Amino acid sequence: MEPAFWDASALVPLCVQQIATPSAQAAGKIYSVVVWWATPVEIRSAMARLVRMSLLTPNQHVGAQARLAELRSKWHEISPDPSLRDQAERLLDRFTLKAADALQLAAALAWTSGRPRARAFISRDAQLLEAARQLGFQDLRI
């Protein structure tokens, strides 16, 4: 399986049944998962929001957490460090990104050693995908 950097927005549909779940599952058959260190926090935040909005029952939440644990056991995680933070700050000057998205994109760049050409970046966030594309990633929207 070819590795790809997955944004949290692309992983939530692998944990919770959503419209994007079939697309995420198809991508999961082609690409292994590389993530930023804080991705589990972002996914858990999305799950908690769905519970609060009554879009996810407590039983579904338990199942989603189990699916997240399974994903985590297989993915490769990029750890934070000062150079990654510095890169994220530079990305904020160049692109219209939220702080967490800049950190994700900086982690993706660290994963590719600054050579993203033709490496897949998977997300549901159009702004983040556009920034990734401009940096040279192959952007895959699910």
Outline where the language-model segments fall.
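Acidic catalytic patch
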Residues: 69-95, 102-107
